[in-house]
Every structure is written in C-alpha cells, then in structure tokens.
Amino acid sequence: MSGGRFDFDDGGAYCGGWEGGKAHGHGLCTGPKGQGEYSGSWNFGFEVAGVYTWPSGNTFEGYWSQGKRHGLGIETKGRWLYKGEWTHGFKGRYGIRQSTNSGAKYEGTWNNGLQDGYGTETYADGGTYQGQFTNGMRHGYGVRQSVPYGMAVVVRSPLRTSLSSLRSEHSNGTVAPDSPAADGPMLPSPPVPRGGFALTLLATAEAARPQGLFTRGTLLGRLRRSESRTSLGSQRSRLSFLKSELSSGASDAASTGSLAEGAEGPDDAAAPFDADIDATTTETYMGEWKNDKRSGFGVSERSSGLRYEGEWLDNLRHGYGRTTLPDGHREEGKYRHNVLVKGTKRRVLPLKSSKVRQKVEHGVEGAQRAAAIARQKAEIAASRTSHAKAKAEAAEQAALAANQESNIARTLAKELAPDFYQPGPEYQKRRLLQEILENSESLLEPPERGLGTGLPERPRESPQLHERETPQPEGGPPSPAGTPPQPKRPRPGASKDGLLSPGSWNGEPGGEGSRPATPSDGAGRRSPARPASEHMAIEALQPPPAPSQEPEVAMYRGYHSYAVRTGPPEPPPLEDEQEPEPEPEPEVRRSDSAPPSPVSATVPEEEPPAPRSPVPAKQATLEPKPIVPKAEPKAKARKTEARGLSKAGAKKKGRKEVAQAKEAEVEVEEVPNTVLICMVILLNIGLAILFVHLLT
C-alpha cells in the first residue's frame, strides 16, 4: 500500500494511503474548495469509520457505508446531540436526541430523520410525553404528563422557540404561531401560561360571544340559547377551564402558542384562578393527538380533581364533553372553542336536551376509550425508549472507535505531507469560540433590551429611517398638468396654509422628493408641469372677476376655454345709463360668476362639446314672468336690444333655477333613500336573528 497527497480539481485534497488508485487504509480528505474534512479509515474510496467536521463546527463520529452515514454514530449539530442508529444517511431506526443546554430530549424510533413510531419526549422542565409520533409530530395516541405547577416552565412568548423544542430545526429555529380555527374569533391569552397545563380560568360564554347589533336589553337580545343555568353560574368554578396550550408549552417540542386562540375574556379574568393553583398540582392528558395538537377524544385531569372528558380540536375543548369540578359539580354539553354553547341543565326543549345528553355520553365514552388506548401506547413507547437508550450507548462506543481512527489518519497525514493543512481542528475551535460569544451575549441581552428598543436610536443619516420619514411629506406629490383632481384636494385649506404651490407639497419650497439638497432627474421631469399646475391651482382661488356686461360670454365660458358671444352687439354706453335694469342684473351676474371658478375646472373636460348653446333656449319657458314687467318702461326705439338682453337674462335665470331645482331634488331624494336602505337592512338583520334564535 502506497500513500501520499493528491489534490483534486475542485480545490479539495486527500492525504493518506491508497491502493489501486483509490483511498484505502487511513487518510484525511477535504471537500471542494477545502470546505469540510473527513479523517478516518477508508475502503477503496469509501469512508468506513471516522470523524467528519463541517465548516460550521458540527461533527459526526461513527460509521459509514457507501459514502453515507450508516450504522451507529453521534452527530453534534448546534446545541443538539443525536446518538443512535443511522440508515443511509438518516437518523433511525432507534436513537436519542437531546439538548446540550437543557434536559430536553427524545428517545424512541425514527424514520427519514424524523421522530416516527413510538417514543418519549422529555421537556426542559421535566414534563414528558409518551406515545405515537408521525413525521416529527405527536400524532396518534399518547399521554402528556406535566411536572408540578410551581416547577413548570413559564411560556412568555408564543413565537419563542425554546432549546427544548425537538422539532425546531426543521423550521430553522423559528416556528409560526398556531393559527386560530377558521370559525373561531381571536381572543386574548392568559397572562402566565405553564408548559403542560391546559386548564385555565376562562370567561363565561356570554363574555366570549361577539356583541352584535342587538344587546341583551332588546327584544331580540332576550332570546337566548339553552345552556347551563345551574348553581355553576354563581360560582367561580362555572367559568370554563380547559384552555389551549403551546402544543405542550415552550417545554414541548417545536410547539408554539395556540394561547392566543383560546382565552375568552380579559387577561385579568384569568389571574385569580391561576393564583389559586397549588404549586404541587400536576396535570395529565390521555387521548388522541393530531398534527402535534390535542384533537379527537381525550381526558385531561388535574391532581386537584378537575377533569374533562370529551372531544378536542387544536388543543381546545370542541365538541361534546363533560367537565367535573373539584367540588363535584359537573358542566356538560357542547363546547365550541373552549366555551359551553349547549348545556343539558336547562330543559326548555326536552327532546333537544335529551339529544345533547346522548351526544355528551357518547363523547365521554369515546374519551375514556381513547384514554385507555393512550395508556397502552405509552407502555409500547416505554419499551421503545429503553431500546433506544441501548442503541445510544452503543453509539458512544462507535464514536470512540471513530475518533481513534481519526487520530491515526491525522498522524499519517502529517508524516506524508507535513505542510498539509488540516481544517478540522480549526473548525472546532471556531465553534467553541462562537458558543462562548453566544453565551456572553445571552447574558448581556436582557439589560440592553430593557433599556429600550433600538429603532428610535437609529441615526438620522440611516437610509432606512430616511425612507420611513419621506413618505409623509410626499403623500400628495405634484401631478402632471393634465390631471385636475390634484389642485382640488388642497383647495379647502389652501387659503390658510398656501399648500397649492408645487414646492410646498414636498414640505420645502425648492425641493423635489425626499432629498431636497441633491438634484435629481425627477426634479427636471416635473419642472415643465409646474406652470400648468400653478395656473390651475391659483385659478380656482382667484377672486371673482368684475361683473361683465355680457351674460352670454360669462355663461358659455364654462363650456369653452375662450369667450363666446351669442347675443346681439353691445349697445352704446348711453343706452346702459338710461336702462333701469343694471341694478338687478349685476346681482345675477355676480352670483353666476362665483360658481364657475370651481365648475370651470371640471365642466369643460366632462362636457366639452360646444353645440349646447341652442339647448338652453328651449329651457327658457318659465322666465317671461319676472322679465316682462322690467321691459315695459323701456323706449320703443330700443325694444329689439332690450328684448335681446331680457331673453339672455331669462335664459340665464332659467338655467340657474333649473340647476338649483335639480340639486334640491337630488338632495331631497338622497336622504330618504339612505334612511330607507338602512332601515331595510336593519329590519332584515333583525328578522334573520329572530329566525335563527327560534330555530336553535
């Protein structure tokens, strides 16, 4: 057998013995670009026993087969340690995975690298779960046993993934909180949940129900469903107890807070009962599990005597069941998200009450049957656990043998190539230093966080802070000249704050965008639009112009962007002085000249066609009454001119009166229509509620 050093094209290298052109005997090999290292024994190009070290510092010590971990071995990955069997690169069939920082561990069977079959989970506080697993989750039948309440871990945040979580690595250390059921409301959680405890003080069913349009004081509000009204209603024990938990608290594996989905009522309602729990009280759940949650039939009981037997859904009492209180009283019926919605005590409808009682009995029988099966599965899990412990001890012996082979390979590599770089020890040193830094940071983090959040202290030069602040002044950016809605927005307060200038929209007179001191292309693009926007904005706020002597020009200026003459030529000034009409006419002209300022910005665009000039002539049918007496005292020589002016004034007044009449009709019609619609909607809702209450 010969030996030496061989460098690969991908940057890796091998230093050790070989035979037949393949690695054989003992040797050390690095991966592509020198990343990763294996040191140990080889068999014609394949690893046999040794130690593989990743650049992160994670290691595997054990046996290999066909280039994959196979047999017995120990994997150190982050803060987790796996000892047991390996099958073609995956954990299993029997093994133990435990946390190096806490007492959390799993002992049992595995499949494809996940907990599968039967096993025992032990959590950081000492609580346990024995039963079935599927794809890394508690699924099937099992028994969850908590530690005394005073020793149970306190869950402070549903988003926090504890080191005791055995399934947290599959979600990269972060676990999303359990979403509430689709038909259940989001409700506040109790203040201090404990791992493994699902029994918590809750509010009454009335407090948990969403408040509708009709309260208890109304006629429809007095229609109630049949529910328990016995002595439980006057006692503190009447309140619902069973509550969702973190799939078994932060002490459970990769479980997150379903606490936000279950508690009815305010947080302070839960405090009295939590304070009354004895520190030695324990809790046990025996029954079905689905997707890592209590779902199906099951029994949950406390050492104090509190007990629930019935159906569960997502760690909540959901279905038919019975709650037995420590004083012997019972609360039974149909539960919905931990709240009793149908009881059997009030016998308003005897037939319906008997059906509910039958379903409750069926739920209790199913829960007792599920509890018996769960105890059997727990016994099987205990036997699997003992077998996994034996495999873990054998894996420790295999790791010792692998380390011996690794030391031999390193010694041989130094002899064959003294200058050969061995990255494995360096990786492990980095990992140790990183752990020391993380531990020191964990000790310093709480006081830093207690002082305050870091976001307000971010410097003003930070681009993120700058981006957060700039959208506020840019809420109304200057628009192109062809968009009239922009000058309309600031119109009500423009006279006070002068917000119509293009620069004022950005908060600075000469700036564009969020960086006024830096010229940008966007500013150059917007500059051509400034004159148009300024003209439109200022035109809307100009004082009314002097009354013109030609009403036709003022009227049709709303339809055209220029003055259009439709009446006869202007009479000489002497004629205007002799006519008695100039006094009432300016009033009409002034009243008409004021509204065109806002209307002129919209009417010309919405109704641009000019042929509307002959249309108003047909509408002037009701006007001769006020105009005829004014035209009588005029001289006959100027009847033609006076008639032209009177007709124009009549047309103008007619249009104004018709427009005012239409606006009045619209306002009169809108109010009763809205009221009627609201009344009809409320009536329909009331009838629907009445119908539902009568049916239920």
Curated annotation (Swiss-Prot):
Belongs to the junctophilin family. This is Junctophilin-2. GO terms for molecular function: DNA binding; phosphatidic acid binding; phosphatidylinositol-3,4,5-trisphosphate binding; phosphatidylinositol-3,5-bisphosphate binding; phosphatidylinositol-3-phosphate binding; phosphatidylinositol-4,5-bisphosphate binding; phosphatidylinositol-4-phosphate binding; phosphatidylinositol-5-phosphate binding. The modification Phosphothreonine is found at T470, T483. Proteolytically cleaved by calpain in response to cardiac stress. The major cleavage site takes place at the C-terminus and leads to the release of the Junctophilin-2 N-terminal fragment chain (JP2NT). Phosphorylation on Ser-165, probably by PKC, affects RYR1-mediated calcium ion release, interaction with TRPC3, and skeletal muscle myotubule development. Residues 573-585 have a biased composition (Acidic residues). The chain crosses the membrane at residues 675-695. Keywords: Cell membrane, Developmental protein, DNA-binding, Endoplasmic reticulum, Membrane, Nucleus, Phosphoprotein, Repeat, Repressor, Sarcoplasmic reticulum, Transcription, Transcription regulation, Transmembrane, Transmembrane helix. Residues 474-487 have a biased composition (Pro residues). The record marks V155, R156, L201, L202, R565, T566 as: Cleavage. Residues 457-471, 631-644 have a biased composition (Basic and acidic residues). Abundantly expressed in skeletal muscle and heart. Weak expression in stomach and lung. Disruption phenotype: Null mice possess cardiomyocytes with deficiencies in the junctional membrane complexes and have abnormal Ca(2+) transients. Mice die from cardiac arrest at 10.5 dpc. GO terms for biological process: calcium ion homeostasis; positive regulation of cytosolic calcium ion concentration; regulation of cardiac muscle tissue development. The lineage of its organism: Eukaryota, Metazoa, Chordata, Craniata, Vertebrata. Interacts with TRPC3. Interacts with BAG5 and HSPA8; the interaction with HSPA8 is increased in the presence of BAG5. Residues 1-674 are cytoplasmic. It holds the Pfam family MORN. The modification Phosphoserine is found at S162, S165, S440, S442, S462, S479, S527, S533, S593, S597, S613. Residues 164-192, 246-273, 439-664 are annotated as: Disordered. MORN repeats lie at residues 14-36, 38-59, 60-79, 82-104, 106-128, 129-151, 285-307, 308-330. A motif (Nuclear localization signal) lies at residues 488-492. A motif (Bipartite nuclear localization signal) lies at residues 345-359. The gene is Jph2. InterPro entries: Junctophilin (IPR017191), MORN (IPR003409). One of its GO terms (cellular component) is membrane.
